[in-house]
Amino acid sequence: MKIAVLGDSDTVLGFRLAGVHEAYAFEETPLDIERLKNKLNELIEREDVGIILITERLAEKVEIPDVKLPIILQVPDKSGSKLGEKALREIVRRAIGVELKR
């Protein structure tokens, strides 16, 4: 099974250097988001792809389907993880009833 990466150019470069051959770079332009959607659907349909890694930032721009295989995981990009920050804000909001904002 192959691993595929969908992300910004820096993230993709890092994964290519780590040996991932199926790595595709996208910007956040409308044209690239459309290309991203098409590539994600193409990778999901392929039987030789077992894991798809997509940066959190790009994952926010597309609908991630709920499929058993391939496994689709969100990874942070060079700006860091947003998921941990969101989870922490929700915990604080529930605990003290106040939403924290930057």
UniProtKB/Swiss-Prot annotation:
GO biological process per UniProt: proton motive force-driven plasma membrane ATP synthesis
GO molecular function term, any single one: proton-transporting ATP synthase activity, rotational mechanism
Keyword Thylakoid: no
Main location: membrane
Pfam families (UniProt xref): ATP-synt_F
Keyword annotations from UniProtKB, A to Z: ATP synthesis, Cell membrane, Hydrogen ion transport, Ion transport, Membrane, Transport
GO cellular component, one term: plasma membrane
Protein topology in the membrane: Peripheral membrane protein
Keyword Cell cycle: no
Subcellular location: Cell membrane
Coiled coil: none
Assembly and oligomerization: Has multiple subunits with at least A(3), B(3), C, D, E, F, H, I and proteolipid K(x).
Similarity annotation: Belongs to the V-ATPase F subunit family.
Known role: Component of the A-type ATP synthase that produces ATP from ADP in the presence of a proton gradient across the membrane.
HAMAP family linked to this entry: ATP_synth_F_arch
Name this polypeptide is given: A-type ATP synthase subunit F
Organism: Thermococcus kodakarensis (strain ATCC BAA-918 / JCM 12380 / KOD1)
Gene symbol of the encoding locus: atpF
